[in-house]
Amino acid sequence: MFARTFTVVVAVLCLVGTTAFAQPQSAEPSSVILFENVRIFDGKSDTLSGSMNVLVRGNTIDRISKDPIPTDRSANTKIIAGGGRTLMPGLIDMHWHTMLVRPTVAALLAGDIGYLNLMAGAEATDTLMRGFTTVRDMGGPAFGLKRAIDEGTIPGPRIYPSGAIITVTSGHGDFRQPFEVPRVLGAPQSRGEQTGAAMVADSPDEVRVRVREQLLLGATQVKLTAGGGVASPHSPLDASTFTEAELRAAVEAAENWGTYVAVHAYTPISIQRAIAAGVKCIEHGHLMDEQTAKLIAEKGIWLSTQAFPDEMADAFPPGSLERAKAFEVFAGTDRTFALAKKYRIKTAFGTDILFSPRLAPRQGELLAKLVRWYTPAETLAMATGTNAELLALSGKRNPYLGKLGVIEHGALADVLLVDGDPIANIKLIEDPAKNFVVIMKDGKIFKNTL
């Protein structure tokens, strides 16, 4: 229902105009695009290249050369004079909630579905215009929006959807009200379940069903909540939710489809139990201890974590339990990144912006905050080449054939032309409207101010 509703309302919007969305130019369908005289950040290196030329043919990078690249200079060829600017891969946010960025919790649980979809569509366009050409959606009904973007109905980033967050009764993501308890098998689903935001599962068998449902709908990976969370009113941070057997059931179901499970987890016990069950990626980890960090490193588990700003707590009322939990998590940020660096944990960058249209425009700023722990080059590499490595864990469930996060021959042409050197001045990414002069996704130009 969510996907059908979204398709209808977006089609109507296209008929009456698109003033509700940010205003990228129409994607230019040139079959050959040549960037001349650019310095390249390739998504891996510590420094920029010298002056180079990059040829994009169709949706892939066809040639990179320090020598001039000849073209037929026909109407199908577009030449972009780089003027020594930086060409870099499009940014990747590994913990995004496409449908949950702008609405309040109350609007999500009680608002009109068509309205929520239109808000998400507008935010998707703005996300692309901030230079984030790919997001990994870590919970919510993003399948319809992904389809609309992929079909060209609306501009937006590539989406790797997880589908509904899978939780337990009383777990993070169970937004039922007290009058909705007890949960009766066969009874109508809660509002959160009806929208596809979250699904409750209370046994290994139920977990298998819920995981398989999300895979049927098109999930590229699956997310479970292994412990308590900030936004859920009945889920204390110290709580461990799924049993190891339940988590293992999810892992087996996902592996049968050639993909992996990521879990929301803050505490040592939640993280350790998930790793024992075969989970491949920990989301957050802000309250982990040194022993747990060692285990993550030894097992080669991914840590997808965030440098939360204090303003993120503004989504919750002053004096609320949720707000208090938020600051408890924020206090662990510095230690989390320090442990990740100390033990060389495979670390991915994401923002996890929720219920805050004011914070969403600061997506690049949250990336730039990582220079507190990493060099600018390491920070940019994390948000491009490193994040793309984690995306590749989805295996054959990967919806986008080709390599992301790098500037190299054969890679998908998701690139940004930056007016300056972001390694020397990473704050350039905080103002994409000014400093990202070209935004290209899948070989199509969505912004060109040159």
Task: Map each language-model feature to its residues.
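Active-site core of metal-dependent hydrolases
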Residues: S162, T169, L224-R335, K346-A348, ...
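Boundary at the C-terminal end of the N-terminal hydrophobic targeting segment
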Residues: A20-P29
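Divalent metal-coordination and catalytic microenvironments
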Residues: V38, V54, N59, G84, ...
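Bacterial N-terminal signal peptides
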Residues: F6-T18
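Metal-associated gating/positioning segment near the N- to mid-region
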Residues: R85-E151, T169-P178, R183, A245, ...
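His/Asp/Glu-enriched, well-ordered alpha-helical/loop segment
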Residues: N256, F330-P422
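Histidine-rich, glycine-flanked metal-binding segment
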Residues: S26, I40, K44-M88
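Active-site mouth loops of central-metabolism enzymes
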Residues: V105-L118, Q189-V209, Y260-A262
